[in-house]
């Protein structure tokens, strides 16, 4: 997971501070299957983004204070040794059975709170904020209301309304995926208007309360969420 800070026009960009932070998952994006240069094979990747509601800064004068964010990317796998499975198990402080892992619905993690440990790593003239570890929220401790609008995207169940809200560079990456190219190939021979699901989430207000109510309606109380 990378968040460049000192490169070209990004020289003054702020990144999440080091340390242990209260966090909430607000975005999960399936990036599809592309060629992995490191491993020299094709891998399907998924990205998780977390807001840090107690760490605020002004990134845009018109918007005022907003929370920092951090992100991490995994291979889309819930195998016993898979990094994503270990990450989710650490998130909730509980081991999964193979059946639980196979049945686990990843998008249920949207809105889930946690504690994350952020470290800074440098490479050449850049500094990155990385998630070193994740753990459950301590008992009795609450995560502040959500600020960012929750978002999830699945390359095998394309939602144009969500896709157009993604950054352009991410859209371009997804368009290179096997899933996107396969869908384009199929639609070239048989096209019909997709039935996009309705997004029932409200846009967050200044304190995020309306959005939190929506999340609680879907997943229950913000406290002690455990999807497995």
Task: Indicate residue ranges for each PLM-predicted region.
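Short beta-rich binding modules
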Residues: 1-228
């Amino acid at each position: 997971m990378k968040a460049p800070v000192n490169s070209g026009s990004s020289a003054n960009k702020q990144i999440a501070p080091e340390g242990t932070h209260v966090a909430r998952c607000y975005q999960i994006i399936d990036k599809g299957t592309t060629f992995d240069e490191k491993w020299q094979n094709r891998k399907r990747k998924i990205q998780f983004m977390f807001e840090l509601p107690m760490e605020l800064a002004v990134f845009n004068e018109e918007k005022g204070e907003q929370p920092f964010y951090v992100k991490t990317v995994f291979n889309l796998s819930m195998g016993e040794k898979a990094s994503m499975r270990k990450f989710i198990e650490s998130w909730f402080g509980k081991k999964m059975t193979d059946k639980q892992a196979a049945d686990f619905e990843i998008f249920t993690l949207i809105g889930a709170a946690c504690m994350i440990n952020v470290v800074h790593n440098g490479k050449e003239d850049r500094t990155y904020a990385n998630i070193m570890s994740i753990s459950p929220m301590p008992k009795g401790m609450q995560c502040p209301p959500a600020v960012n609008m929750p978002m999830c995207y699945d390359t095998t169940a394309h939602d144009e309304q969500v896709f157009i809200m993604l950054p352009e560079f991410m859209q371009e990456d997804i368009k290179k995926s096997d899933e996107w190219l396969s869908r384009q190939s199929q639609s070239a021979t048989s096209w019909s208007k997709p039935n996009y699901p309705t997004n029932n989430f409200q846009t967050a207000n200044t304190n995020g309360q309306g959005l939190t109510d929506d999340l609680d309606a879907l997943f229950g109380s913000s406290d002690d969420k455990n999807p497995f």
